[in-house]
Amino acid sequence: MSLRYLPLLAAALLLTACAAPQPRPGEGVDVGEASSLRSLIPAAELEKAASLQYSQLKRAAADKDLLAPDNHPQVIRLRRIAKHILPNAARFNAEAKNWQWEVNLIISKQLNAFCMPGGKIAFYSGIIDNLTLSDDEIAIVMGHEIAHALREHAREQMAKNKLTQTGAAILGALVGGGELFRLGGNLMTLKFSRDDESEADLVGLDLAARAGYDPRAGITLWQKMDAASNGAPPAWLSTHPGGEARIAEIERNLPAVMPLYEAARKPR
């Protein structure tokens, strides 16, 4: 493709975005198609970069005795919750069934969690311990982070960054030459748009409900988060709206996911 057509392509892709429809009772959330912009970034290279950064994180944590072992009670807990959530991941991204999923715990006071492209999940012990998270609340956090990976928000954001910061010609050279992430930044600290964050909230709510975790835990989670941060979003979700707005959006979408929860609920 000629580079002179790339800005026109980007504009056309942006115009394909559409607003999220109203929730339909009992049918789960409908967030539409993922952004076509993500096609500007090769998924395989992004997942390779994510896997490398995740390995580096684990190695650095292990060197400081901060990587929780496999027999740590919270690691066992996190992996059990993930085991319930992940069977529904392909509903939002068919490629998820081919990802090499990992779940690990970093011993840190940070209120943080993430899921990198390709299914690399990490929780920091601070978000579990400081907020005294229930299994349902952990499922909401985990579902949200998994949703970012399933909806390929990092891939979309990097495409936007390249279009904005380096121009269409450089983007074309990067994609064509395989030097994708030299200017890409740290995938663990990549900031998503508010729309992406809101979408991840809804998809995460759906994933948790289908796994048999109470989606109403999103309300208590944000009450705890607000109390811990004096009403300001922590670094974990710094681009989000405040707790009151988030709780209102969760409540608005509960009719779409509560029947899923009721159908999936079983003793744990």
Question: What is each of the regions a protein language model found here?
Answer:
Residues 5-6, 18-268:
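A Zn2+-metalloprotease active-site environment signal
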Residues 4-12:
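Sec-dependent N-terminal signal peptides
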